[in-house]
Amino acid sequence: MSLPEAASAAAAMRQINQAWQTGRLDELASMLHRGMVMAPPGFGGRAQGRDAILAGFRDYCENARTVEFNEHDLQADVIGDVAIVTFRYDMVYERAGARSRASGRDLWVLQKHSGSWLGLWRTMFDMEEHPS
């Protein structure tokens, strides 16, 4: 694994997180592969395709507000043109007048296309959520 490539994949993951947190969905779209898949926690169903993934982020951006988002324990492993990036997160958000605290682990598979990392696949696990 190339350390510069791992650092590059980690930086791409941070850019993805910043884009959805600030509602920059056009920018986020440019960081997702058109065939991206999201397997929700527990793997019950799936969202397939960039438009479906963006719809989930759009719903969040239109109906919730991120108060606080912290990522930690970010690890990126790169093999060839594929990166597996995982991180723990803690966040506080407001939705429908209620404040909630959520935590868990996010796992993304990224692939390098024309010099840029694109999201291919995502899931979340170890999730906990409760009123804040």
In which residue ranges do the predicted regions lie?
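Generic short beta-strand segments
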Residues: 35, 87-93, 126
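Generic hydrophobic alpha-helical segments
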Residues: 15-16
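Residue-level signal for tight coil/turn positions that link beta-strands
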Residues: 80-82, 114
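Short, cysteine-centered beta-strand-loop-beta hairpins and adjacent loop/turn segments enriched
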Residues: 91-101
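A solvent-exposed, acidic/Ser-Thr-rich amphipathic alpha-helical stretch
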Residues: 6, 10-12, 25-78, 100
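Short beta-strand edge/turn micro-motifs at domain boundaries
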Residues: 101-132
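Hydrophobic/aromatic beta-strand elements that line small-molecule binding cavities or substrate pockets
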Residues: 57, 71-76, 89-91, 105-111
